[in-house]
């Protein structure tokens, strides 16, 4: 952290229990047999297009995006950094209201969809084709008024990643992450032993992330968010999605998926949804007052 950051104290050595726990969970996940990293999965144009089309046909999608944008309170004309900005979910609306937006996105497939979305929206922004871990401070330029990382915390050394966010921001940092296991993770935990003869360790969750920040001397707000279930029209649709997601390659694995979803899907007003609920968290703090328990200013 920068020594001049208001409210942040360097006098006590930082403990690393939660930071190391995050690293261990990420390492366990990446070494799981059959696991495909998020970077690999989202560098597939078919996966990106499938998610993009599906999400934007859901009635709840735009409402969720609007709620997140409103919760961040980013003023018109602000200088904004969107880490792992994907197809422009937050970046394009912010650019449309006059913000100077920079998107860091390592996936070529995501950047391709982002460029298409920019062309149709008539807005412009800066795109840096890189991982957050590989970006230098000189590439980022002047400090940002807001930094966003929405479901893009794939980095194993979360402490270094958060340090860099704190250092390049003169306003607020906003992290969106899983508070409870998302539906796809619950499916993976249920099916990975049957498909790959291994346990699925899952992602570290928002409680771990908040504790990492606390260890670093950052008193962040955590606001829970309820997530709407993904709607499918047929069992075939969900089997196709998870056949790819769960690194399947055989007809036997497809039958395991079909049998599982036959019992786990239930009807809703719009189609079929997976049983169970998922919650996420919006974690945010003021970088100029990171060490103060009062983060309302």
Annotated model-derived regions:
Residues 87-134:
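Class I SAM-dependent methyltransferase SAM/SAH-binding core
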Residues 202-217, 221:
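Short alpha-helix
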Residues 153-168:
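A short, conserved alpha-helix within the catalytic core of class I
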Residues 170-181:
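Conserved beta-strand signature within the Rossmann-like core of class I S-adenosyl-L-methionine
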Residues 2-74, 77-86:
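Conserved class I S-adenosyl-L-methionine
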């Amino acid at each position: 952290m920068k020594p001049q950051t208001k409210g942040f104290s360097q006098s006590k050595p930082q403990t690393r229990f939660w930071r190391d726990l995050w690293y261990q969970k990420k390492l366990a996940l990446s070494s799981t047999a059959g696991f495909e990293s998020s970077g690999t999965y989202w560098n597939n144009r078919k996966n990106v297009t499938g998610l993009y089309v599906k999400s934007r046909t859901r009635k709840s999608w735009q409402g969720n995006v609007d709620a997140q944008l409103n919760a961040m309170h980013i003023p018109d004309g602000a200088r904004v950094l969107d880490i792992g900005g994907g197809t422009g979910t937050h970046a394009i609306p912010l650019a449309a209201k006059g913000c100077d937006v920079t998107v860091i996105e390592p996936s070529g497939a995501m950047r391709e969809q982002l460029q298409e979305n920019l062309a149709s929206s008539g807005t412009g922004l800066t795109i840096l084709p890189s991982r957050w871990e590989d970006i230098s401070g000189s590439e980022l330029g002047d400090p940002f008024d807001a930094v966003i990382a929405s479901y893009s915390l794939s980095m194993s050394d979360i402490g270094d990643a958060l340090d860099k966010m704190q250092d390049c921001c003169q306003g607020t940092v906003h992290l969106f992450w899983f508070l409870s296991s998302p539906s796809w993770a619950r499916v993976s935990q249920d099916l990975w032993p049957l498909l790959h003869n291994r346990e699925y360790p899952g992602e570290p969750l928002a409680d771990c992330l908040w504790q990492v920040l606390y260890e670093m001397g950052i008193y962040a707000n955590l606001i829970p968010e309820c997530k709407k279930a993904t709607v499918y029209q047929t069992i075939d649709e969900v089997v196709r999605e998870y056949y790819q997601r769960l690194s399947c390659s055989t007809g036997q694995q497809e039958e395991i998926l079909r049998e599982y979803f036959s019992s786990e899907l239930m009807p809703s007003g719009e189609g079929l949804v997976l049983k169970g609920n998922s919650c996420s968290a919006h974690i945010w703090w003021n970088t100029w007052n990171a060490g103060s328990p009062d983060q309302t200013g």
